[in-house]
Amino acid sequence: MLKSRLRMFLNELKLLVLTGGGRPRAEPQPRGGRGGGCGWAPFAGCSTRDGDGDEEEYYGSEPRARGLAGDKEPRAGPLPPPAPPLPPPGALDALSLSSSLDSGLRTPQCRICFQGPEQGELLSPCRCDGSVRCTHQPCLIRWISERGSWSCELCYFKYQVLAISTKNPLQWQAISLTVIEKVQIAAIVLGSLFLVASISWLIWSSLSPSAKWQRQDLLFQICYGMYGFMDVVCIGLIIHEGSSVYRIFKRWQAVNQQWKVLNYDKTKDIGGDAGGGTAGKSGPRNSRTGPTSGATSRPPAAQRMRTLLPQRCGYTILHLLGQLRPPDARSSSHSGREVVMRVTTV
């Protein structure tokens, strides 16, 4: 068996050597098609049948099915429709920018949930303007219940809300509390109970006729001092943790009560700035540090009087200080006082 396979292999090797050396080698053709298909004239002695002869020698003379990759001639079929011309990149950027601006101007969004009016009515509860102006009432109530503050964190305006009614006790919801908040609530409750009990006992033992023997005993007098000290400690603890517990109570109240949030009314805002509400502290800071913005609405006489008053006050104060000094010190420091007055005037 092995010998027969070796003989067959040697015979095939001899045949391959003889056929490869006796026939001229075909020139390579371009991939685009047959000889001369790319625009170049075929070489002399080069036949287009060489490739077909090789295929016939390798595959045989029987017809075979050609694959997609082996088709010599392109198949005729419907051409795809031409693609529409693309606009230049600058036009695409301008189109996207204009669409985003139009969508931002036409559809305001809630600054908490980033949803539009389809999720509910949008309110404007504070002085904030721009993209942080609107919010949904349920989103605002939920934010207040999480934060515990009824003022805007940007413009510090206190929300105008109306308490409609308290929910049914069966519908009350618990709020999320941290470990520190639970400890604060426990400290307030225990301190209040101890304070009430100790003060009640002290009042009874000091006023009741039946406790006359207790007031005369030394041990009870020591207890009076200890209870008095613990009462002071409990009062300090309640004062220290009272604000935190009150904030927790306001959070719970925001969840378990029905509210109606009112829109910001500029005419009723006494402490608001004249500009009408930019977010943050820019309004009060500008009103304090920018006198030119408010001076445009004042008459010139009032503006001049306002600028002269600080200078006259400075002169008056320096004059009084100079009169209080002794005569020798006043004469020796006359030049120094002149310098101070000039600096104040500048």
Curated annotation (Swiss-Prot):
Q: Which organism is it from?
A: Homo sapiens (Human)
Q: Which GO terms describe its molecular function?
A: ubiquitin-protein transferase activity; zinc ion binding
Which regions span the lipid bilayer?
A: 185-205, 219-239
On subunit structure and binding partners, the annotation says: Homodimer.
Quoted from the entry, the domain comment is:
The RING-CH-type zinc finger domain is required for E3 ligase activity.
What is the topology of this protein in the membrane according to its UniProt annotation?
Multi-pass membrane protein
Gene Ontology cellular component terms for the protein in this record: Golgi membrane; Golgi stack; lysosomal membrane; trans-Golgi network
**Enzyme Commission number(s):** 2.3.2.27
Under what name is this protein listed?
E3 ubiquitin-protein ligase MARCHF9
What task does this protein carry out?
E3 ubiquitin-protein ligase that may mediate ubiquitination of MHC-I, CD4 and ICAM1, and promote their subsequent endocytosis and sorting to lysosomes via multivesicular bodies. E3 ubiquitin ligases accept ubiquitin from an E2 ubiquitin-conjugating enzyme in the form of a thioester and then directly transfer the ubiquitin to targeted substrates.
What is the first-listed, main subcellular location in coarse terms? Golgi
Quote the biased-composition stretches of kind Pro residues, using this chain's numbering.
77-90
Residue spans of biased composition, Polar residues class = 284-296
Q: Which residues form the signal peptide?
A: none
Keyword set, alphabetical order: Golgi apparatus, Lysosome, Membrane, Metal-binding, Transferase, Transmembrane, Transmembrane helix, Ubl conjugation pathway, Zinc, Zinc-finger
- Zn finger region (RING-CH-type): 102-162
Pfam families linked = RINGv
Which residues does UniProt call coiled coil?
none
- Pathway the protein takes part in: Protein modification; protein ubiquitination
Q: Which GO terms describe its biological process?
A: protein ubiquitination
- Catalyzed reactions: S-ubiquitinyl-[E2 ubiquitin-conjugating enzyme]-L-cysteine + [acceptor protein]-L-lysine = [E2 ubiquitin-conjugating enzyme]-L-cysteine + N(6)-ubiquitinyl-[acceptor protein]-L-lysine
| Residues where Zn(2+) 1 binds | 110, 113, 136, 139
